[in-house]
């Protein structure tokens, strides 16, 4: 699978399948990287106008007809407070729209992992289950549906929300969504039978263990960023640009806020390269999850929708 296809191939794949999941290119809005370097030494990394410019630079340069953005709020969000997340979402929607690209920004909850997994291969497993219609009521599917509804409306492919939801449900239940994903993988150089035989292609960690809590209780809160950084430490992300990524590691079967855990119900399953790495990740996960006796519910998933003002 080639995540960095030549522009011609990228265009051909989009024309033939309707989608291409690829990495960014340094040739599009190249000044962004240099400007970030200046921000880093001028204490302006947290400047919302400059963050907005950085986020939108490549997107506007690519010539989009419309844009839908997902801006997170909560312990796993890029911005440190709900107020800052809200300010960023509004800024992105307005600036992009005023630059000629009608934009909608959804403010969605990230106070816990969006999916019951975090990593690379484990997230692909979840993705395939979603495409097969096996996670109809999951949090990640709810967010995906809201984003897709906005995209269909922005692209003038449907007249309203009800028509968009009908179209989405049909794509999932008919198998069309899974079929298009499989075709995209094949067109970008991946295996033709990936959907049918994904287990044969996805990396599997040598050490897979359940992570049990030190005491029983109900999940009250997550430090979602800490969960993500634990995956990075396992090798599932990069701390340096030249570092390699271990696609096999991460967490699966992660509990949600409001779930009860004990000696029989683990917090998650850790996938690691070594026993030592698994033990460190397990300790980090326990520290990232707050347990208590009270019933708990997650924050509202879709919190606000910002439509750009011209």
PLM regions and their residue ranges:
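Phosphate/pyrophosphate-binding betaalpha-module
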Residues: 1-62
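Well-ordered secondary-structure scaffolds
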Residues: 17, 44-54, 58-310
């Amino acid at each position: 699978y080639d995540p960095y296809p030549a522009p011609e191939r990228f265009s051909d794949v989009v024309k033939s399948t309707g989608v291409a999941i690829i990495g960014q290119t340094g040739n599009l809005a190249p000044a962004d990287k240099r400007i970030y370097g200046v921000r880093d030494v001028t204490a302006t990394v947290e400047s919302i106008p400059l963050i907005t410019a950085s986020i939108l630079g490549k997107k506007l340069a690519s010539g989009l007809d419309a844009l839908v953005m997902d801006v997170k709020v909560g312990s796993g969000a890029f911005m440190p407070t709900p107020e800052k997340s809200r300010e960023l979402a509004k800024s992105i929607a307005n600036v992009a729209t005023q630059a000629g690209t009608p934009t909608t920004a959804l403010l969605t909850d990230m106070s816990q992992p969006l999916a019951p997994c975090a990593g690379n291969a484990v997230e692909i497993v979840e993705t395939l289950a979603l495409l097969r219609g096996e996670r109809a009521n999951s949090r990640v599917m709810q967010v995906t549906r809201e984003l897709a509804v906005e995209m269909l409306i922005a692209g003038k492919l449907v007249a309203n929300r009800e028509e968009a939801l009908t179209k989405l449900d049909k794509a999932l239940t008919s198998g069309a969504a899974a079929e298009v994903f499989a075709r995209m993988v094949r067109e970008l150089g991946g295996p033709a039978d990936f959907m049918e035989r994904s287990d044969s292609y996805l990396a599997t960690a040598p050490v897979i263990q359940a992570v049990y809590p030190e005491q029983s209780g109900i999940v009250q809160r997550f430090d979602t960023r800490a969960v993500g950084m634990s995956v990075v430490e396992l090798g599932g992300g990069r701390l340096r640009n030249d570092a390699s990524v271990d696609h096999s590691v991460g967490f699966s079967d992660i509990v949600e806020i409001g779930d009860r855990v004990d000696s029989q119900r683990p917090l998650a399953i850790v996938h690691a390269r070594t026993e030592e790495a698994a033990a460190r990740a397990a300790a980090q996960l326990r520290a990232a999850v707050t347990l208590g006796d009270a019933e708990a519910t997650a924050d509202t998933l879709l919190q606000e929708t910002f439509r750009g003002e011209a």
